[in-house]
């Protein structure tokens, strides 16, 4: 904001000396962010002054003490200066914070003042509306009851009727209540009351909110913090002299010699330092430290106070915006009140319908009668033409072969009368109005309807214009007005004309009385100056012939003179001649007296006219001054109101600008977030693609692992079945061995029982040991082989054990372990076969009777050992078989889990594939939208020399104008290919990878950074251009308003157009009474005379142009059409009769303009003297310089105006206008007075005809200069009239 509490504008930013910035994060009511704390100033540390003295009698010790004190004082002074600087900065910041809060409060005051003004306007409107509503709520029942008492006809079906039928519905007449739904009105009463209460409550809420805002603002104004700040300037000025004193004392001590007196002085000086100077410096430093702490506290307090005040201001402004929005949207609409108002308006509406029915019925009748009359007249014309054609054809039938005697005719038809309104008479309207007048509640409606009823007889504008048969002497207008003008219209028009003539008569009578009064007052000027003048010169006119009595006396004397002498005869003759001379002299004297009386009367009239003109001009100027002063006061009030409105609009514009800036900032942030999201989406898409590839690889590896697991499970099942078979074979072998040892015995079920039974049988075989000695060697050899086999079996067992352990760790070695087990089983089978063979051999030997108990025992022990080993091997083999089964079961479960996981992974991959497709489509769509946005902004994205470039479309078109340039520069469109969306539909992984890489490459081709830079640059260019255009538009608008306001009240003198203010003056052509616009180089702008102008009583007319018609004179039409009747000037009331093609008698081919104008300031006083004729007084002024001697004070105004008018006529008159037409319509008295002067001027003009051509040219130049001078004078008079005295 500025220091005046106004929002800073970009246009005036360079002219502002200081501005105040506010952070919304801290001043907003919703945000509770902590204020950033500034670093605290370094505190002022105070040290004790040095007071250590090693030797009181040593001068150097004293010098060292003084040096230490000087250093301490200098450091203390420096720290105090830094503290003073900190105090100044803190005080300055405190003042800025306080001023910022005051500026914000001033801005709030402006807004609150505007709000109060708007609320006062809204409150006034609401009070008026509430008053109307209250009146309607109080009177609607009575108005509804009045409707029931007012009779009305039921024929108007288009008026609103109730939804339910009523009694006596078949009657033709009823009441106005029949046109109102009483039930709905009864329901609308409570609803309207409730709506009015709600509206009143809404107004009260707004008033309460405005009051709270005003009270809050007033509290802020009352709670203004104290802005007084303390400085340490005086303290710093006190401590500096003390520091300089210590320094000067140190320098003084350095220059002293070492003696007892010097030491005493030094000691005394040091004591002064210790007691006075050093404590004073410490006290001042402590005060400065306290001032620094106080400045810090004051700054903190001011910051907190300003923060709280700005938050309150922000809260008030937010509420103020809401209240302003509520006031702006404050409206009231209620159907219930509309129903109630219809009850009040129904009498007036019904009366208007009655009047409209009469008007339409009369118009229809008039149209029918006029159409019949028109058809009859046209048929008469057609019959006459038909007879003329027949007659002509009959005369020319010998030379022609024309047989068509038909004459074109016109058929008149009426249309648009499908809907007939009910027939209403004027008597019905008068009766209805009387009914309303008798009802006390409808008097106003009756008065309005009575006025509307009177307007039925008022003629329309066209009828008033057609009522005048001769409009500027045109017979064509008479023919037009004769049609569609019947007796009723004639009566009305004649009545209007009668009223106008009566008004004119009253005006003429008042003017005549005024002239008689002037003549009576100035009649003494016409009497002779001497009382005996009439004795010498009788009043009766003298005649050159003597009267009959004198003639008879002279005859009788001549008869008697015959007796007289010659001398007497001579005397008689002399007397006769003297009488004749006396008669001639008397006639001459009487003529001179009449001329003097006429000249005196003329001068008197001129003086009266001049005085009247002056009084009229003075009155006109005073009236204009009053009007101008009133208008000036009104305009000043309007200017103030508009200034307030402009400030409000500027504030509103600033708020809108701020909101737009915030929206722009939010949009930038959203764009940045979208860019980040797009980048994240790209990254997620890449990660998803990598995950998808990894998942595909994992699926492939899982599939391979599953296949391997299945194969291994098959192998394990095979191993388990083989082991089971091996166990069965071992069981069968042991059973066979038992059966061999005991052929008739029963074989036990378990292997251990079999082994025990074999042991028992082996003990029985010891009896036959002696028989087996011969076979001992063989048995020993067999024993050795069996031991070797057992060792092999043990080694095989260990190998199998290690193989099983490796099988648990590595599944790949399962097949080898199974093969080893198979080899072991084969070895055991071979061993069992060998044992079986040996047992058979022993049985055969026993059967043969061989003995050898010892060898047999050994052999049996060996066999038992073998059997134990074999049983252990079998137990181990069974354990391995069980473990193998368990492992097989675990691997089966693992295989099932892998298959389930495989299915889940497949389903998840399918879902992710669909999501990837949707993501790819969305990315593709976003890229297309961004490219389309660039195209709409006028950009084109192209690839040029391997780089992405955003250019204007015009540049790209210019670049692609020729194929050679396109091929050389490498400009290629970057629009993505839609077929790349199917990258996941590849038949092979390599093809899918290639498509995916192409898709990523197409996406990477569109750079978001370049897009953002282009859009931001484009937006900035648009903003700059918009600001420029807005500034220019404001300038042009202000210039237009200024020029319009200046030109509205100025008189135009060239380039006339509609709406201009023009000064119209009469031309010299008195025969046609033409008026033209005052102009400079723009002639032939003539005024269309209207009755309201009253040009007969005016010398000038100030009017505003409403219409301009451009015309060209074409005399060929008038010559071909025949010469119209020309009436004499004395016979025609409006001057000579003229033709519409050339009403002002201009030359052929001349372009002229006919202006319609309305008087700008009607009611200007008329001038009685100059209003009669504007040319004759000009002639009097022009010729009066020859014979008459006028006083300069009596006729300055009239002379100036007449000279201006004369120059205006000379400048505006066309070359084709006839200047020789004598002014026939002039004031009779003025014309009589001017005739002698005209005769004398004609004689003088005849005498001056012999002047040279150079003299006439000089006179022409003088006339031009005089015309220019009069134009300047007239401009000054006009400017004085406009500005006021």
Swiss-Prot record:
Ranges annotated as spanning the membrane: none
Positions in coiled-coil regions: 73-150, 486-523, 563-726, 769-937
Subcellular location: Preautophagosomal structure membrane; Vacuole membrane
Region feature (Disordered): 32-52, 523-568, 595-615, 1116-1142, 1181-1285
UniProtKB keywords: Autophagy, Coiled coil, Membrane, Protein transport, Transport, Vacuole
Annotated Polar residues bias: 601-615, 1197-1215
BP GO terms, sorted: autophagosome assembly; autophagy of mitochondrion; pexophagy; piecemeal microautophagy of the nucleus; protein transport; reticulophagy; ribophagy
Listed GO MF terms: molecular adaptor activity; protein kinase binding
Recorded topology in the membrane: Peripheral membrane protein
InterPro entries: ATG11, Atg11_C, ATG17-like_dom
Biased composition (Low complexity): 551-562
Extent of Basic and acidic residues compositional bias: 1275-1285
Source organism, top-level taxon: Eukaryota
Any single Gene Ontology cellular-component annotation: phagophore assembly site membrane
Major place of residence: membrane
Assembly notes: Homodimer.
Family (UniProt): Belongs to the ATG11 family.
PANTHER family: RB1-INDUCIBLE COILED-COIL (PTHR13222), RB1-INDUCIBLE COILED-COIL PROTEIN 1 (PTHR13222:SF1)
Function: Involved in cytoplasm to vacuole transport (Cvt), pexophagy, mitophagy and nucleophagy. Recruits mitochondria for their selective degradation via autophagy (mitophagy) during starvation. Works as scaffold proteins that recruit ATG proteins to the pre-autophagosome (PAS), the site of vesicle/autophagosome formation. Required for the Cvt vesicles completion.
Record's protein name: Autophagy-related protein 11
Organism: Emericella nidulans (strain FGSC A4 / ATCC 38163 / CBS 112.46 / NRRL 194 / M139)
């Amino acid at each position: 904001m500025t220091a005046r509490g106004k929002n800073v504008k970009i246009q005036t930013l360079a002219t502002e000396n200081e501005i105040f910035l506010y952070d919304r994060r801290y001043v907003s009511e919703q945000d509770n962010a902590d204020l950033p704390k500034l670093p605290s100033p370094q505190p002022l540390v105070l040290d004790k002054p040095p007071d250590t003295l090693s030797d009181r009698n040593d001068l150097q010790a004293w010098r060292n003490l003084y040096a230490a004190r000087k250093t301490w004082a200098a450091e203390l002074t420096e720290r105090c200066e830094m503290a003073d600087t900190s105090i100044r900065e803190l005080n300055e910041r405190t003042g800025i914070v306080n001023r910022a809060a005051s500026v914000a409060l001033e801005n709030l005051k402006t807004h609150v003042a505007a709000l109060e003004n708007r609320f006062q306007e809204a409150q006034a409107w609401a009070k008026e509306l509430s008053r109307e509503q209250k009146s309607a709520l109080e009177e609607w029942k009575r108005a509804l009851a009045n409707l029931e008492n007012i009779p009305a006809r039921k024929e108007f079906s288009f008026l609103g009727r109730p939804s339910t039928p009523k009694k006596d519905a078949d009657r033709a007449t009823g009441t106005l209540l029949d046109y109102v739904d009483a039930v709905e009105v009864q329901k609308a009463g409570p609803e309207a009351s409730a709506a009015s209460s709600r509206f009143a409550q809404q107004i009260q809420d707004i008033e309460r909110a405005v009051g709270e805002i005003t009270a809050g603002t007033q509290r802020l104004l009352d709670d203004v913090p104290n802005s007084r700040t303390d400085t340490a300037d005086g303290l710093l000025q006190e401590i500096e002299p003390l520091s300089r004193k210590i320094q000067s004392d140190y320098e003084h001590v350095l220059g002293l010699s070492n003696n007892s007196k010097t030491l005493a002085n030094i000691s005394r000086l040091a004591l002064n330092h210790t007691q006075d100077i050093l404590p004073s410096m410490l006290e001042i430093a402590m005060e400065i430290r306290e001032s620094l702490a106080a400045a810090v506290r004051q700054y903190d307090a001011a910051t907190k106070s300003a923060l709280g005040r700005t938050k309150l201001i922000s809260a008030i402004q937010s509420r103020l915006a809401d209240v302003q929005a509520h006031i702006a949207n404050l409206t009231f609409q209620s159907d219930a009140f509309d129903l109630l108002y219809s009850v009040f308006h129904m009498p007036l509406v019904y009366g208007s319908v009655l009047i409209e029915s009469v008007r339409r019925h009369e118009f229809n009748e008039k149209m029918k009668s006029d159409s019949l009359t028109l058809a009859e007249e046209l048929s008469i014309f057609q019959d006459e033409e038909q007879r003329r054609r027949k007659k002509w054809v009959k005369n020319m039938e010998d030379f022609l072969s024309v047989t068509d005697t038909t004459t074109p005719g016109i058929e008149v038809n009426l249309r648009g009368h499908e809907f007939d309104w009910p027939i209403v008479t004027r008597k019905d309207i008068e009766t209805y109005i009387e009914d309303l007048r008798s009802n006390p509640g409808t008097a106003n409606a009756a008065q309005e309807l009575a006025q509307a009823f009177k307007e039925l007889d008022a003629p329309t504008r066209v009828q008033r214009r057609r009522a005048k048969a001769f409009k500027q002497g045109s017979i064509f207008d008479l023919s037009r007005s004769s049609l569609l003008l019947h007796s009723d219209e004639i009566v009305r028009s004649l009545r209007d004309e009668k009223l106008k003539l009566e008004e004119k008569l009253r005006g003429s009578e008042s003017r005549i009385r005024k002239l008689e009064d002037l003549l009576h007052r100035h009649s003494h000027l016409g009497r002779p100056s001497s009382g005996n003048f009439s004795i010498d010169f009788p009043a009766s006119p003298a005649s050159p012939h003597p009267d009959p009595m004198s003639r008879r006396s002279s005859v009788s004397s001549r008869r008697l003179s015959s007796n007289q002498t010659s001398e007497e005869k001579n005397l008689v003759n002399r007397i006769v001649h003297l009488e004749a001379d006396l008669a001639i002299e008397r006639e001459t004297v009487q003529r001179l007296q009449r001329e003097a009386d006429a000249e005196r009367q003329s001068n008197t009239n001129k003086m009266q006219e001049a005085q009247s003109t002056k009084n009229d001009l003075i009155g006109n100027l005073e009236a204009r001054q009053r009007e101008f002063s009133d208008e000036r006061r009104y305009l000043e009030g309007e200017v103030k109101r508009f200034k307030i409105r402009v400030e409000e609009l500027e504030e509103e514009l600033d708020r809108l600008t701020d909101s737009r800036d915030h929206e722009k900032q939010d949009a930038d942030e959203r764009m940045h977030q979208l860019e980040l999201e797009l980048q994240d989406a790209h990254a997620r898409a890449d990660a998803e693609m990598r995950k998808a590839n990894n998942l595909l690889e994992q699926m492939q590896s899982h599939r391979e692992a599953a296949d391997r697991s299945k194969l291994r499970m098959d192998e394990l099942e095979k191993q388990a079945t083989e082991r089971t078979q091996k166990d069965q074979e071992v069981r069968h072998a042991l059973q066979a061995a038992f059966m061999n040892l005991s052929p008739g015995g029963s074989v036990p079920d378990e292997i251990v029982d079999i082994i025990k039974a074999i042991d028992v049988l082996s003990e029985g075989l010891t009896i036959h040991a002696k028989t087996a000695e011969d076979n001992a060697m063989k048995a020993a050899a067999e024993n050795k082989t069996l031991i070797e086999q057992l060792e092999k079996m043990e080694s095989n067992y260990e190998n199998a054990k290690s193989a099983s352990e490796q099988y648990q760790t590595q599944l790949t070695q399962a097949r080898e372990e199974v093969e080893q087990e198979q080899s072991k089983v084969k070895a055991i089978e071979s061993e069992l076969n060998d044992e079986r063979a040996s047992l058979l051999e022993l049985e055969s030997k026993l059967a043969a009777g061989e003995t050898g108990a010892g060898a047999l025992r050994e052999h049996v022990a060996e066999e038992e050992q073998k059997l134990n080993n074999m049983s252990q091997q079998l137990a181990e083999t069974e354990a391995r078989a069980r473990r193998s089964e368990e492992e097989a079961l675990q691997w089966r479960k693992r295989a099932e889990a892998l298959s389930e996981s495989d299915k889940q992974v497949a389903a998840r991959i399918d879902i992710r594939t669909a999501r990837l497709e949707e993501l790819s489509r969305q990315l593709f769509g976003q890229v297309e939208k961004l490219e389309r946005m660039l195209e709409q902004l006028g950009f084109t994205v192209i690839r040029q020399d391997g780089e992405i470039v955003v250019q204007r479309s015009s540049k790209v078109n210019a670049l692609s104008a020729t194929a050679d340039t396109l091929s050389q520069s490498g400009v290629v469109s970057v629009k993505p290919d839609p077929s790349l969306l199917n990258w996941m539909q590849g038949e092979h992984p390599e093809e899918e990878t290639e498509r995916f890489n192409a898709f990523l490459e197409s996406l990477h081709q569109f750079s978001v950074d370049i897009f953002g830079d282009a859009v931001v640059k484009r937006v900035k260019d648009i903003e700059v251009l918009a600001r420029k255009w807005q500034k220019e538009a404001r300038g042009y608008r202000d210039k237009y308003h200024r020029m319009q306001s200046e030109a509205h009240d100025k008189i135009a003198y060239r380039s006339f157009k509609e709406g201009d203010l023009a000064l119209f003056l009469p031309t010299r052509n008195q025969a046609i009474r033409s008026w033209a616009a005052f102009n400079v180089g723009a002639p032939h702008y003539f005024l269309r005379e209207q009755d309201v102008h009253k040009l007969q009583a005016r010398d000038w007319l100030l009017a505003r142009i409403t219409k301009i018609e451009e015309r060209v004179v074409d005399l060929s039409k008038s010559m071909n059409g025949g010469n119209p009747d020309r009436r004499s000037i004395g016979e025609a009331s409006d001057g000579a009769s003229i033709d519409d093609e050339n009403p002002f008698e201009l030359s052929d081919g001349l372009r002229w303009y006919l202006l319609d104008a309305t008087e700008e300031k009607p009611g200007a006083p008329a001038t009685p003297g100059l209003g009669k004729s504007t040319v004759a007084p000009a002639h009097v002024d022009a010729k009066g310089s020859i014979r008459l001697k006028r006083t300069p004070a009596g006729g300055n105004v009239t002379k100036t105006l007449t000279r201006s008018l004369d120059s205006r006529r000379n400048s505006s008159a066309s070359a084709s206008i006839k200047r020789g037409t004598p002014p026939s319509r002039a004031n009779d008295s003025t014309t009589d007075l001017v005739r002698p002067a005209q005769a004398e001027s004609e004689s003088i003009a005849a005498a001056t005809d012999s002047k040279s051509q150079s003299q006439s040219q000089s006179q022409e130049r003088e006339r031009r200069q005089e015309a220019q001078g009069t134009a300047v004078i007239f401009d000054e008079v006009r400017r004085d009239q406009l500005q006021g005295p």
